Amino acid sequence: MTDHSHENWRPASNPWAVAIVVTLAVFMEILDTTIVNVALPHVAGSLSASYDESTWVLTSYLVANGIVLPISAFLSRLFGRKQFFLICIVMFTICSFLCGIATELWQIILFRILQGFFGGGLQPTQQSVLLDYFKPEDRGKAFGLSSIAIIVAPVLGPTLGGWITDNYSWRWVFFINIPVGIVTVLAIYQLLEDPPWESKSKEKLSVDWTGIGLIALGLGCLQVMLDRGEDEDWFNSNFTRTFAVLTLIGIIGAIYWLLYAKKPVVDLHCMKDKNFAVSSLLMAGMAMILYGSSVVIPQLAQQDLGYTATWSGLVLSPGAILIVLTIPLVLKLMPIVQTRWIIAFGFACLATAFFWSRTLTPDIDFETLVLFRSAQSIGLGFLFVPLTTIAFISIPRRLNADAAALFTMFRNVAGSVGISLSTAAITERSQAHSAHLATHTSAFDEPFQQTIRELAQAIQNFTTQVGDPTGIATGRMYQAMIEQSRFLAYVDVFTILSVVALLLIPFCLLLSPVKSEGSAGAH
């Protein structure tokens, strides 16, 4: 079949029915990356393991998931896209069941590795399906549907996981995947079909074991380093330094091999497309901001403001809803406003929203915290669909699968980097602020000593049943200093995220205006 006939290929099934089903599968997979987080203490207790050991339940999933992402296009061609997608969902569902019945920690870690491996093929395959099933002018709407899964699932995960664990058992965190998996398998079997350029391609494919090995080494070690780095005191430990060296060897070796190999496992030619390359960079930056803030804000709510897991989830939920409501407006704007200006506006909104944190105080209430997150969500709503649409606008159909795999990989890896850097910055900046404030708490600092005397007097006036009012007052002052240091650290992280968003705006201007019909246009 000629390239021209490939471009004119249209699926027999309703594209929207297919889009809903494949997005449901991706929603299930993304939900699984966060739903387990709050259940870890229960998993550790049930399986007689320490909390630190139980965190490998998360790490193992992320490592396997990250390795498969870039090679999913090759696997899709090897097995056929429909068959590969079905294998991924079936095995993901089976592994979910096995995780739920595990009786030893090593068992659940093994099944999570397999679950992450098969789950890693879902996101890029879903995106390539949307690219092939929808005309360029309709892709914006399809990506809008996909964005809902990417946005809502990570936010819903901790809240749903906490509710399930509190009311039932941690095992049901895995069991809820089973009915969703069964429904999606049956629907995809009926609806999905392979495009002609991928059908039976496995007959002419050879396996690039070197490329696969280098990718597995580089991305696998990177995910371990990012996920375990803070617990291992980052580069002060031999563990982190070793994995950093292995990461560099794997990634540099993989790039060199993929560029010069005759039949590489990942086709990097799509990176020659300027819009795709710049959009990938911008999506990576947005993912760093989104995932970093999505971890830091609940951490602030739970550890410093005393919120439950459910209430901290509710802090994020209105923002997720706001993004979903913003998407139709963005789709209306895309045919009449240059896409690069919409993206630049989104990053400007993000920068402004995060800079607002400098006006917040440690006694912030629930409503203000929700507004703070919602302000960020307005900017995020102007980024998801335009970035994804313009990234693929000029990619040839034969490269859709490779481009989707790389685009998803950039987003997920950058998200992991954002989480690790944000949590590490909280610790480092908290210590720095504590050291600074401690210089004002000596016995020779008269304002501090005066405050101690006044607080001690107030305690003594309130009740006489105290042994040492001055000691109690001093303890409270030091506790207040620690709380103030922690809050200032959060403000510092939000300020850094604001600067990152600001620095990304000039890159939006590198996007080439592309004339196209409807919402796909970036004219």
Residue ranges of each PLM-predicted region?
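Transmembrane-helix exit segments and adjacent C-terminal regions of multi-pass membrane proteins
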Residues: 1-26, 193, 256, 263, ...
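A membrane-interface helix-boundary motif in multi-pass transporters
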Residues: 166-178, 228-240, 308, 427-499
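Small-residue-rich alpha-helical segments with characteristic i,i+4
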Residues: 147-150, 155-158, 293, 369-453
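Helix-loop-helix hairpins in multi-pass membrane proteins, especially solute transporters
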Residues: 69-212, 228, 237-238
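Helix-loop junctions on the cytosolic side of multi-pass membrane transporters
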Residues: 186-205, 256-265, 362, 428, ...
